[in-house]
Amino acid sequence: MAKYSHFLPLFLALLFAPDLGAQTYYRSEEPHCTAPKDSTTLLGLDIVGEGFFRNDEYASDLVADYTLPGYRLRANLSYRPETRLPIELRLGVYNLYYWGATRYPAALAYQDLPYWRGDGDRYTRLRLLPYFQASIQPAAGWAILLGHLQGGAKHRLIEPLYNPELNLTADPEMGLQIRYEGQRTRLDTWVDWQSFIFRGDKHQEAFVFGLSTAQAFDFSPTDRLELQLQAVAHHRGGVLNERADTVHTWLNAALGAVYSHRFALPKHPLTLQAGLYGLAYSQRGEHYASDKGWGFLATAGLSWRRWQTELSHFYGYDFISPLGIPFAQSIGRAGRSHLLTHHPRYTAWQGSYRIIESEAYTFGVSGGLYIHPHSAHSISSFIEAYLSISPRFTLLHRRGR
């Protein structure tokens, strides 16, 4: 019994909470880039501070246990001139800090370290990056971004394609993004350029292409069916790349349908969602031990006010996703050249509660329990507290406003 004692607080929290759910609160107070701009502000100051404390109790043959205590901070000036088409320029700095850390790998992006981003022996005392974003809204519901993108949880990717924990660890995405938000249609496509190379550099050129789109069909005021297509493609290499065995391309895609029904309760509606996805994986470059794979994901969830809960089940065959959660992978800690299993599978129960949510801040807690029989230790869990504060200050008003 002592072996599982550290799961007891998490189990009780999941059991006695009205509803708990997936982690959808990351920067939830931040409006989508397609939302109408403030028509009165000419020059503003934006501050986005995210404090987090997350503890992962993971199966040792999949990924090591660890704790993430720290913050992400962004401060930028925003300039919104009065033009026929709304445009905005943001300039600032971004900082990632882990409590107790005294040095950080001097890589360009914090994913898959230290295989290709950096030489492995270069460090910096402070993780500070420039922030730049230029955006335009060419039509209602449309936005085009150059520079830093609106990424992470805003892409709405499923967990086998994108690990929610990257909202706390990955650097901001940079490149080009085109986004549309309509009443029934959603489109988000982007290129995240993670690594640029000059001749003689030891690391690779690398970028990620992503697509997240959905089309909804309303059968009644309370019933909706949404068809979704999601894809993430990674490429590493480049014409100037001089390293051997470092040109690779991976593609992950998912096609799914999500049904939702809203129950009209006296004060606040209760929403039920059920989804089914088919997933595919393909590789060029012989980096991983599997070239092709597939999987299925089934989800069911409830949301009520600021509470959410989700139950999901995944089953795959030789499936690998570079950005996905570790429990959906056919590989483990033994390395990329060795398949831990041909059949990765897990059942997950997750929940979150937005304790406070407003236009300027979000305070939430979440927890999750994973059961993965393909691992020697079949139970993993996490628990997390998250506080995001995003004040915006007007420095100059437009004339006549």
Residue ranges of model-derived segments:
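Surface-exposed coil loops of outer-membrane beta-barrel proteins
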Residues: A143-A214
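Transmembrane beta-strand segments of Gram-negative outer membrane beta-barrel proteins
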Residues: C33-E57, I87-L89, A274-L276
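Exposed, low-structure sequence patches enriched in small/polar residues
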Residues: T24, V48-F52, G70, Y131, ...
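Surface-exposed strand-loop-strand hairpins of Gram-negative outer-membrane beta-barrel proteins
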Residues: E50-R72, Y104-A106
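Surface-exposed extracellular loop regions of Gram-negative outer-membrane beta-barrel proteins
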Residues: N76-Y97, R179-W190, P269, G275
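Extracellular loop and loop/strand-boundary signature of outer-membrane beta-barrel proteins
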Residues: A59-V63, Y115-G120, L161-P164, Q194-G200, ...
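Surface-exposed loop and membrane-interface regions of Gram-negative outer-membrane beta-barrel proteins
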Residues: R84-Q137, E159-P160
